[in-house]
């Protein structure tokens, strides 16, 4: 009893490692696309913990691919220049000047900060944008009217990502994309992550958000849906109970699973080590979406 009390913390750590073992075995060599955004990008401690999770995933055999946003930092930079941020249905109105600033902030600042942090933690990251290696080809998105240089992805060339993964690197992708017209397009990071996950036939697509996951009742924080098959997810969308920023995220997950991604996850990026908790524990912490009904495990 004395020894158990003395080594209590160490025993707990050992139990956690044992619980993770089947997941490490199951996902070894598999690709996981992570959309990194929200509070996890703004809080220094959360930022470090997310990158620690990513590096650990790589060391235990998974192939993480990060796709990041940066909306708040873009808005902050625009404000310093006296440029007002305008949005239509959550999409940033992007004129030529704004497009230049979006590219500068996403590719030149945020992307390199993420790469530096991963490298400092012992990983090997390479930062790229959708322009590099013709990764993300886009055209003007007119679904919400003409918002300027807002694009929709029409083609994904995963060759550069696969090359980086094969050589042991962690790809970090800014969703600034190119068009056949020679223009630069600002593409929604959730959408870009979903398209990349589909093209890679990823094991998992994980969206880090500022909510617990998908709620059955948005007014009831205890109504988290931990697992959904596609039929359930589509019915929930059609019911009108999903609103706000969760609509495009759930749509993105549904489409990804329909197009070959095995599991899509919407998790709370405000929780410490949320990626590890979702991937390597029996219960997980957010909402997991799959094509068919789930067994009793989190695999």
Swiss-Prot record:
It is an enzyme of class 2 (transferase). SUPFAM superfamilies: Carbamate kinase-like (SSF53633). GO terms for cellular component: cytoplasm. Keywords: Amino-acid biosynthesis, Arginine biosynthesis, ATP-binding, Cytoplasm, Kinase, Nucleotide-binding, Transferase. The keyword Lyase does not apply. It catalyses: N-acetyl-L-glutamate + ATP = N-acetyl-L-glutamyl 5-phosphate + ADP. InterPro entries: AceGlu_kinase-like_sf, AcgluKinase_fam, ArgB, Asp/Glu/Uridylate_kinase, NAGK-C. Its EC number is 2.7.2.8. The record marks 35, 249 as: Transition state stabilizer. Pathway: Amino-acid biosynthesis; L-arginine biosynthesis; N(2)-acetyl-L-ornithine from L-glutamate: step 2/4. Pfam families: AA_kinase. One of its GO terms (molecular function) is acetylglutamate kinase activity. It comes from the Bacteria. CDD domains: AAK_NAGK-C (cd04250). One of its GO terms (biological process) is L-arginine biosynthetic process. It is found in: Cytoplasm. Signal peptide: none annotated. Substrate binds at residues 70-71, 92, 186. PANTHER family: N-ACETYLGLUTAMATE SYNTHASE (PTHR23342), N-ACETYLGLUTAMATE SYNTHASE, MITOCHONDRIAL (PTHR23342:SF0). Catalyzes the ATP-dependent phosphorylation of N-acetyl-L-glutamate. Belongs to the acetylglutamate kinase family. ArgB subfamily. This is Acetylglutamate kinase. It comes from Caldanaerobacter subterraneus subsp. tengcongensis (strain DSM 15242 / JCM 11007 / NBRC 100824 / MB4) (Thermoanaerobacter tengcongensis). The lineage of its organism: Bacteria, Bacillati, Bacillota, Clostridia, Thermoanaerobacterales. The gene is argB.
